[in-house]
């Protein structure tokens, strides 16, 4: 939802715009599901929103980066959502049942988002040279955020999320699963992955890669990313613009 607040102009047809709008609608629905779980734990939704726009609450690293071209739309829907679904599937066996239940719906819908992203990418890499270059340029910018996506290589027995069975997969295992599934597909399309050190070690069955800059990840998720302030400013503006709806619909907000 956050990523698409400033949508780039469509480069294919109205169908692309409709598909992207449907994806955004799904993402809004996912946010609603998660807010309901948080409310059940005792934190009001209004407080969640206040914490978000004040900068108190953190949000995922990928939402701190700008969406510049239609190439970004494809890379986000195909690769960022692919990385996300790896993490989300690790939550299907979450020890907190209400959270595990909503993840079933979220995973099902995210699988369609990946197909949408793949279609966008296929159309562009088989289109004009300019379209191909837009995809490559977007991949170049998004690769490090993708490598940051699953977090640092903390041992599973030291990860509270794993110890408490919130998730069922260690960070590095999730990253390796993503690389296993998508590096071959990226290369098959003729795209170049911007990491000369990336290679598959046949002996270990693991991917080797340039160590991501974890200091940058920490900086980004604490509100210092390329589009962090823009995202929060837009949220504040949106909150102000719809405040009258709350006053009309909710007596306690009046």
What are these regions (language model features)?
Residues 51-77, 94, 127-128, 142-165:
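Acidic/His metal-coordination segments adjacent to aromatic residues that form catalytic metal sites
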Residues 133-254:
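Extended, helix-rich structural scaffolds rather than catalytic motifs
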Residues 9-30, 53, 107-112:
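Long, hydrophobic, well-ordered secondary-structure blocks that form the structural core
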Residues 1-22, 84-99:
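Helix-loop segments that flank and shape redox-cofactor active sites
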Residues 1, 31, 35, 114, ...:
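A structural signal for well-ordered alpha-helices, especially hydrophobic packing surfaces
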């Amino acid at each position: 939802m956050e990523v698409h607040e400033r949508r780039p102009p469509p480069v294919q047809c109205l169908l692309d715009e409709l598909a992207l709008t449907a994806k955004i609608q799904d993402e809004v629905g996912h946010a609603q599901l998660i807010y309901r779980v948080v409310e059940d734990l005792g934190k009001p939704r209004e407080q969640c929103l206040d914490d978000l726009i004040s900068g108190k609450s953190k949000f995922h690293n990928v939402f701190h980066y700008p969406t510049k071209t239609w190439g970004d739309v494809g890379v986000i829907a195909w690769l960022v959502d692919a990385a996300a679904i790896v993490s989300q599937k690790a939550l299907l066996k979450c020890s907190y049942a209400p959270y595990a239940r909503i993840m079933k719906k979220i995973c099902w819908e995210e699988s369609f988002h990946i197909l949408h992203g793949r279609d966008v990418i296929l159309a562009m890499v088989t289109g004009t040279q300019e379209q191909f270059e837009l995809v490559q340029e977007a991949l170049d910018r998004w690769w490090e955020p993708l490598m940051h996506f699953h977090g640092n290589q903390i041992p599973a027995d030291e990860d509270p999320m794993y110890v408490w069975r919130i998730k069922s997969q260690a960070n590095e295992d999730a990253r390796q699963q993503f690389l296993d599934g998508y590096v071959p597909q990226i290369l098959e399309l003729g795209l170049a992955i911007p990491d000369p050190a990336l290679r598959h070690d046949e002996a270990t069955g693991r991917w080797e890669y340039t160590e991501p800059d974890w200091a940058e990840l920490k900086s980004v998720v604490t509100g210092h990313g390329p589009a962090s302030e823009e995202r929060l400013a837009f949220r504040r503006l949106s909150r102000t613009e719809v405040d009258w709806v709350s006053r009309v619909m909710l007596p306690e907000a009046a």
